[in-house]
Amino acid sequence: VSPANEEGWSTQHDIARRAVEAKFGDKIKVTTVENIPENADAERVLRDLAQQGNKLIFATSFGYMNSVLKVAKEFPDVKFEHATGYKTAPNVANYSARFYEARYLAGKLAGATTKSNILGYVAALPIPEVLQGINAYTLGAQSVNPNIEVRVVWTSAWYDPGKESDAAKSLIGQGADVITHHTNSSAVASACEEA
């Protein structure tokens, strides 16, 4: 869904890929594909990767879930790992982390730091992981300051630096003095630094 150099989610996956390549060298072959939309194109790319002989395929975005399940049925000898999903199959597993725990702690810090009692949250898409994060952040903030209000602006995209920056500026305009984000670029941080 975004380029490997976007400084966020995809970058972290790419760092892990490079570490695996460094450890195993020519014992493994790694294929990467960037900027795959969460639509029928994902299904095409997954199928191509399986047809090329890849035995383990990482689908690194929630929106790939149904495409992974469909292609996995066609290639029972290929293993698929799907990020942040919740559906599985004999050859499909999910991987994730407890992101909400860190977001709760970030909320506590934000709640203790704000002067306006208005916190901003730039969010990509209303999927379970993002909603958990918003809720955890809000609960963390309200645990130290019950007067906190968290305002959310949705970008409807994981990676759109322009929309992310505009969302941050909108929240600043609404009085938010601490802003966090669940998107893939550093545009929110840059917009806040410029304000």
PLM regions with names:
Residues 17, 104-152:
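An alpha-beta-alpha
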Residues 73-97:
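Flexible loop/hinge segments that line or gate small-molecule binding clefts
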Residues 50, 111, 172-173, 193:
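Non-catalytic positions within long, well-ordered alpha-helices that form the structural scaffold/packing
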Residues 29-48, 156-172:
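Structural motif
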Residues 1-20, 32-42, 62, 126-132:
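Extracytoplasmic "Venus flytrap"
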Residues 53-61, 81-83, 174-185:
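Periplasmic-binding protein-like
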Residues 129-176, 181:
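Extracellular/periplasmic Venus flytrap/periplasmic-binding protein
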Residues 2-5, 37-38, 63-66, 85-89, ...:
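Solvent-exposed loop/turn segments at secondary-structure junctions
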